[in-house]
């Protein structure tokens, strides 16, 4: 269908333009490598060799012309290629250095799944003062959290996926001489499209936390599943006929998983709504306070919510208006609730110290300040409170 092909061509141009204006260097690199890999693979197929060559030439010329006429693109790229000693240090590279130090202390099993954010304060670089949340390199975060053993197991799975895709490739690619029943098959497009898409996600994951975004993670898993399913065309061994028992068992298993996930997902949904309401309210308003308190009741395991409640009460108490002592005492209780969930969080210790200091209990405050400094020695905010 010629019309549909023209539509797809224009859609690709719009997508390319959208990626260009994101000003994401990682996005540009991932797009460039994936398109080059796609065209190189087509160059090896005699039926599409001419079209792939023309497309490659057009993209190279078009990319050069766009880059040559865009000062914004030049400036963005020069930030990477021409960084000198006077330029600001890349925060991302400092996070990577801290992550490598983290891995060196936990080489084999890592710090634990999802524990990077908690462990980062022990390895913080003095020029990185905020919580990064993620490493901004999925593979490095995988190594730090799961260690060599976990990284090796997951790497083995990825290697098997790549090997399966390569094995499937020669069975699904249609030659020009194929005039049989598979002439209009989309198997080759499916294998090639999923493979190139996963390549793009992998390249971008070197510079960001792609797979920690649920939508991206689900997309990657779906693409991998579709790619694996194409193995059935390589040999009859991969065909499996399901009977009634297997279908009933699989359905029951899915329903059981959905049942056990419904309660935590419902709580997460309620918490997200309350936190959104709190973020939209004025910083020290009663609306924000009530929303945060309700969110803490819905999901007590979130250490950040009680900390935020305590911070609001502390700021109100430090106005030193009548009744401020009670506000500071309640703030201390909320900070302690935060520590019940994450006992090594440095900020609640520092805030408890501030509350006690404001109450004139300086001797009681000192151990809390020292504990905060011990947990997060390179945090200038913690140091300032000392």
Regions found by a protein language model. Give the residues of each.
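Lipid-exposed faces of alpha-helical membrane segments in multi-pass integral membrane proteins
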Residues: 6-17, 29-40, 57-60, 149-162, ...
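Hydrophobic transmembrane alpha-helices and their immediate junctions
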Residues: 148-189, 360
